[in-house]
């Protein structure tokens, strides 16, 4: 079984890469928080729409990563490249289609969901530029799948730093009009994010060409479209695509409900969500590691090590989160002051931070256990569990947010409900279901 050192050697670079990537999220939120509440709220709605679409590609890459990790564990290294190449081709076509769809219907969709005219206008100003990122981010996730699948994760850290630095500099320059560039506000934030994603893909291409044994991994020649291979990948990926989309779509429903409570509540939700995402970074890194190591272990014939491996990573994740939550709960005002200097907004956001801190303790275990299921290749079961949980999530937020119009901190209790259900259903599945013989 994998040692703590081996687990950490895979997960730590992923953690650093996620940390650097989330500099983009924090930077956008923090800088726009100093522009206006409308800009902050509009970037939240536009950003969530973008992420909902992006998660379809991310779900495909996660399924591809499972296949790549299984081939790597089996020692079938030359079969890794074809999975990567077919994935890139598929996602580029998907980027074209989703870009066209958003251009044609994005405005109509947002008009139905956003009640405030000023928020709507800001959201569309952001989205009109942000969706160009599809062409870069969709390809980036396949490089991520490749390197996690073959457990060469250190490159992800460097790549994320390149992307984060590009975004921070361009965000500051384009939002506020520095370094001789025009002041563009929320539009500048969108353009900065797109250019940061472009810098990321440029780095990945150069790094892969210079450092990877292209022949060993079957990356030394381009291949024609292979429908049979793509269908094998999709037999795993289609479930993760739908799973991730549904998961993010419920976040979007959450923000739609909050937007109807008012601009102040939407601003609070965006700030607290940013803190929430940062707290989740080590959990997501360890969950991704679980996914890859479980698939590698099964590929190498180590099915008996799967449950002990998941339990070990889950304990690791919980104790890391315990430390982060302690700091966050003791100093919430300091964290909130990064995003806004308005004293009243900080004070009103503190209760929501406490709620999220409690939810994160459950999430630290739930995400690891749930990703263990995906790592076995049983992505259809993972989708079913996620769907059950999401139906309850959606019903809860519609009831307390849209019907009762409860305070924002009460709305955030949905995260406690969500992760509790996810943990219980995932644990029961791994204990009771027959997942050991899944072939991919």
PLM features per residue range, with description:
Residues 14, 18, 30, 66, ...:
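Transmembrane alpha-helix boundary and packing residues in multipass membrane permease domains
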């Amino acid at each position: 079984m994998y040692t703590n050192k081996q687990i950490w050697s895979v997960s730590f670079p992923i953690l650093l890469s996620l940390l650097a990537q989330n500099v983009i999220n924090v930077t956008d939120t923090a800088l726009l928080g100093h522009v206006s509440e409308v800009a902050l709220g509009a970037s939240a709605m536009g950003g969530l729409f973008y992420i909902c679409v992006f998660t379809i590609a991310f779900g495909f890459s996660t399924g591809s990563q499972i296949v790549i990790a299984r081939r790597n564990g089996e020692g079938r290294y030359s079969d890794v490249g074809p999975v990567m190449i077919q994935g890139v081709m598929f996602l580029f076509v998907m980027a074209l289609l989703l870009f066209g769809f958003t251009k044609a219907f994005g405005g109509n969709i947002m008009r139905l969901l956003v009640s405030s005219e000023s928020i709507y206008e800001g959201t569309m100003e952001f989205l009109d530029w942000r969706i160009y990122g599809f062409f870069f981010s969709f390809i980036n996730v396949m490089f991520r799948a490749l390197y996690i699948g073959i457990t060469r994760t250190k490159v992800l850290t460097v790549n994320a730093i390149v992307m984060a630095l590009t975004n921070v500099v361009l965000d500051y320059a384009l939002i506020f009009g520095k370094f001789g560039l025009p002041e563009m506000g929320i539009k500048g934030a969108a353009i900065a994010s797109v250019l940061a994603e472009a810098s990321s893909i440029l780095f990945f291409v150069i790094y892969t060409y210079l450092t990877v044994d292209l022949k060993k991994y079957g990356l030394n020649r381009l291949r024609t479209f292979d429908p049979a291979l793509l269908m094998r990948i999709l037999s795993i990926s289609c479930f993760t695509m739908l799973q991730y989309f549904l998961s993010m779509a419920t976040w979007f429903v959450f923000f739609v409900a909050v937007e109807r409570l008012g601009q102040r509540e939407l601003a609070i939700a965006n700030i607290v969500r940013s803190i929430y995402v940062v707290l989740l970074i080590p959990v997501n890194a360890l969950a991704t590691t679980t996914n890859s190591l479980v698939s590698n272990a099964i590929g190498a014939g180590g099915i008996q090590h799967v449950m002990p491996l998941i339990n070990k990573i889950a304990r690791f994740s919980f104790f890391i989160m315990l430390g982060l939550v302690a700091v966050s709960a003791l100093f919430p005002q300091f964290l909130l002051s990064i995003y806004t200097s308005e004293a009243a907004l900080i004070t009103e956001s503190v209760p929501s931070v406490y709620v999220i801190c409690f939810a994160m303790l459950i999430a630290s275990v739930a995400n690891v256990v749930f990703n263990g299921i995906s790592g076995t290749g049983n992505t259809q079961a993972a989708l079913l569990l996620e769907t059950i949980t999401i139906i309850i999530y959606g019903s809860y937020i519609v009831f307390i947010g849209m019907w009762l119009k409860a305070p924002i901190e009460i709305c955030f209790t949905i995260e406690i409900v969500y992760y509790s259900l996810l943990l219980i259903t995932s644990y029961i599945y791994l204990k009771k279901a027959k997942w050991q013989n899944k072939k991919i």
